[in-house]
């Protein structure tokens, strides 16, 4: 872990970044004790971020207006031993507030390689997303964080992020999702 500022360049991801982003997604899932849940392939991630036709069902490569379903920003980190490589990434998509009538950004994943934590990359990625929100008139930037992830919780507090304790996340998957769908009028 480093505490000295780094000079990595933040930029939108490109298709060439997909293998490194996927490796970091797996690293993040392992840290979150959920590696066994990662099913996404290079092809699916490419489709999500850049469009195209994925092999698996359930992947909307683009939104109805043709925009990618999700976006990613990466940090190019100068590495003396390996050359430039990705040091961090943020994967996000648009959400909507019916109360404000505007979009917002939902941050699905923020990951900084362990040896680069404290480098400022996480903060710089969040600043880039906040700037994007401001430039486009989006009114919120939000994400989930595991309640046991104290380093992340502390980091987010330093940025002014507030936990929304009055909300509880709900999810329906697998057989329960199929059962719910079976009861829907068609």
Labelled PLM ranges:
Residues 9-21:
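A short beta-loop-alpha structural element at the N-terminal edge
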Residues 22-58:
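Conserved GNAT-fold acetyl-CoA-binding loop/helix
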Residues 43-74, 106:
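A short helix-loop-beta-strand connector motif used in the catalytic cores of GNAT acetyltransferases and
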Residues 72-74, 84-93, 106, 111:
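Conserved beta-strand in the GNAT
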Residues 85-87, 96-107, 117, 164-165:
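A conserved beta-turn-beta hairpin within the catalytic core of GNAT-like acetyltransferases
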Residues 113-115, 119, 147-148:
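Active-site acidic-Proline motif in GNAT/NAT acetyltransferases
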Residues 123, 127, 135, 147-166, ...:
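Conserved active-site alpha-helix within GNAT-family acetyltransferase domains
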Residues 134-144:
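Conserved GNAT acetyl-CoA-binding A-motif
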């Amino acid at each position: 872990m480093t505490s000295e500022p780094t000079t990595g360049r933040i930029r939108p991801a490109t298709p060439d970044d997909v293998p490194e982003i996927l490796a970091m997604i797996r690293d993040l899932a392992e840290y979150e004790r959920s590696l066994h849940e990662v099913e996404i392939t290079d092809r699916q991630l490419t489709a999500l971020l850049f469009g195209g036709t994925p092999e698996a069902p359930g992947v909307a490569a683009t939104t109805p207006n043709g925009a990618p379903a999700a976006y990613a920003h990466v940090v190019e980190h100068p590495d003396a031993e390996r050359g430039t490589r990705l040091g961090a990434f943020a994967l996000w998509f648009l959400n909507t507030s019916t109360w404000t009538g505007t979009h917002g950004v939902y941050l699905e994943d923020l990951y900084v390689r362990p040896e680069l934590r404290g480098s400022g990359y996480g903060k710089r990625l969040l600043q880039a997303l906040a700037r994007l929100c401001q430039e486009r008139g989006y009114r919120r930037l939000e994400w989930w964080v595991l309640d046991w992830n104290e380093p992340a919780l502390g980091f987010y507090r330093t940025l002014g992020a507030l936990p929304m304790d009055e909300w509880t996340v709900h999810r329906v998957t697998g057989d329960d999702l199929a059962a719910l769908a079976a009861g829907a009028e068609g």
